[in-house]
Regions:
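Pyridoxal 5′-phosphate
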Residues: 1-167
């Protein structure tokens, strides 16, 4: 308890402040001064539904379905002759990292976004991985139990359309 009283808050926000003035703030006592912002109430309530869903569907069924989607996406992407896929499907599920030759990953993401497709781009906090492949970043697609093969087909169709624009 003595340490809690000696430590200063590392961030600010609602629910942790006794009083705010133009030149100072007074914080709540004890651990309360470290509880900035609104607690994640909706996330806690939603987590229960997530557990129910996983128990109903079965974690192994979810894994198998995601693995099937990943294999399908990998097969479709492998048909491109101007793509570099950085993942080994045998050791990966749900995420595929790639680059298209001659197309910057951020440009790709911006145009796919216009087609309501969200991908991640950049170094993904994995700079050693990027250095290993001598790249600054890549595009990363991922999917889960809520995706379908139709989603992947739409992605592939959109990827072809975007390539025509950017090349």
């Amino acid at each position: 308890e003595s340490w809690i009283n000696r430590l200063s808050p590392y961030q600010g926000g609602g629910s942790m402040i006794k009083n705010v003035e133009t030149d100072s703030s007074t914080y709540l006592d004890g651990f309360h001064k470290f509880e900035a912002g609104t607690p994640p109430i909706a996330q806690v309530v939603g987590f229960s539904s997530c557990i129910d869903f996983i128990n109903e569907v079965g974690i192994n069924n979810i894994y198998s379905f995601e693995n099937e989607l990943t294999q399908y996406a990998y097969e479709q992407l492998s048909k491109f002759n101007d793509i570099k896929i950085y993942d080994d499907f045998k050791n990966q599920t749900s995420i595929i990292s790639f680059n298209l030759n001659g197309i910057h990953f951020n440009d790709l993401a911006m145009l796919l976004d216009k087609k309501n497709i969200a991908i991640r781009t950049g170094h993904h906090c994995a700079q050693p991985f990027m250095k290993h492949f001598n790249i600054t970043g890549n595009a990363r697609m991922s999917f889960g139990v809520y995706n379908t093969k139709d989603d992947i087909d739409y992605f592939i169709k959109s990827l072809n359309e975007v390539k025509k624009i950017l090349k």
